[in-house]
């Protein structure tokens, strides 16, 4: 049996919730609760309020999603860069 197609959307994080979940407002105005993907947790990618993110939604439950990518546009500098030896 083939896996169902996931719906790709983009939105903005409006609230950080406990248990690494986030309230996200999609570009079309809908609100949903999303969690960060396992690879994002593995590589310690931090998601903050106001970040633009890409999400995957299941066609069966459109109120929950998985954050798969964080866009860096509009963010300030990340801090001083360390020199490698």
From Swiss-Prot:
Residues 1-72 form the S1-like domain. InterPro entries: NA-bd_OB-fold (IPR012340), RNA-binding_domain_S1_IF1 (IPR006196), TIF_IF1 (IPR004368). Keywords: Cytoplasm, Initiation factor, Protein biosynthesis, RNA-binding, rRNA-binding. The keyword Iron does not apply. Pfam families: eIF-1a. Its main location: cytoplasm. The keyword Protein biosynthesis applies. CDD domains: S1_IF1 (cd04451). GO terms for molecular function: ribosome binding; rRNA binding; translation initiation factor activity. It is found in: Cytoplasm. GO terms for cellular component: cytosol. One of the essential components for the initiation of protein synthesis. Stabilizes the binding of IF-2 and IF-3 on the 30S subunit to which N-formylmethionyl-tRNA(fMet) subsequently binds. Helps modulate mRNA selection, yielding the 30S pre-initiation complex (PIC). Upon addition of the 50S ribosomal subunit IF-1, IF-2 and IF-3 are released leaving the mature 70S translation initiation complex. Belongs to the IF-1 family. Component of the 30S ribosomal translation pre-initiation complex which assembles on the 30S ribosome in the order IF-2 and IF-3, IF-1 and N-formylmethionyl-tRNA(fMet); mRNA recruitment can occur at any time during PIC assembly. PANTHER family: TRANSLATION INITIATION FACTOR IF-1, CHLOROPLASTIC. This is Translation initiation factor IF-1 1. It comes from Aromatoleum aromaticum (strain DSM 19018 / LMG 30748 / EbN1). The gene is infA1.
């Amino acid at each position: 049996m083939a896996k169902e197609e996931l719906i790709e959307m983009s939105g903005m994080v409006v609230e950080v919730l406990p248990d690494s979940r986030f309230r996200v407002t999609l570009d079309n105005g809908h609100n949903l609760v999303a969690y960060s993907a396992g690879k994002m947790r593995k590589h310690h990618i931090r998601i903050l309020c106001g970040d633009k993110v890409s999400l995957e939604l299941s066609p069966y439950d459109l109120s929950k999603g998985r954050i798969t990518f964080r866009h860096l546009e509009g963010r300030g500098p990340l801090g001083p860069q360390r020199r490698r030896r």
